[in-house]
UniProtKB/Swiss-Prot annotation:
Gene coding for it: hslV
The organism's place on the tree of life at top rank: Bacteria
Compartments, as annotated in UniProt: Cytoplasm
Assigned protein family: Belongs to the peptidase T1B family. HslV subfamily.
Main location: cytoplasm
HAMAP family xref list: HslV
Keyword terms, alphabetized: Allosteric enzyme, Cytoplasm, Hydrolase, Metal-binding, Protease, Sodium, Threonine protease
SUBUNIT field: A double ring-shaped homohexamer of HslV is capped on each side by a ring-shaped HslU homohexamer. The assembly of the HslU/HslV complex is dependent on binding of ATP.
Identification of the protein by name: ATP-dependent protease subunit HslV
Molecular function terms from GO: metal ion binding; threonine-type endopeptidase activity
InterPro entries in UniProt: ATP-dep_Prtase_HsIV_su (IPR022281), Ntn_hydrolases_N (IPR029055), Proteasome_sua/b (IPR001353), Proteasome_suB-type (IPR023333)
Amino acid sequence: MSDNLTMHGTTIVTVRKGGKVVIAGDGQVSLGQTVMKGNARKVRRIGKGNVIAGFAGATADAFTLLERLEKKLEQYPDQLMRASVELAKDWRTDRYLRRLEAMMLVADKNVTLALTGTGDVLEPEEGVMAIGSGGNYALAAARALIDTDKSAEEIARKAMEIAASICVYTNSNIIVETLDAG
């Protein structure tokens, strides 16, 4: 696929602070230099509603991975870390899954994780993590705000606003999901 027809998209940020965990994402999907959709929902609740997830990358691939994670959560209820490690093993070793191009941030009341196609399952430092085209901007903004008196949601929203003002593949149509954290 030429660069003109490459799907670009998304910024996802997570913040864990003050007894809350938040994942926020924008709604833009771009094909080359064209915005194809401005209100895509890339942050959602999965499982029994006790896990929140946000994804960046190819949308169909991300949905496949979300479905697989939900199945792992059925196998390992209330064990997000275990379910994520098992998904990462499959993702790395399965011929079909290995070709999927997406990343995910997932969180429950106890843990926040980034899942990558290389089999990495990473926990954030300082309670913040971000992925996607504007991920570095959102991460820098969230880290700068984490020690302020702002709430987790306020930090996530501000980080997304900053990323949207810098990254052309990120818009300000922000979707936020929040859970009480342990």
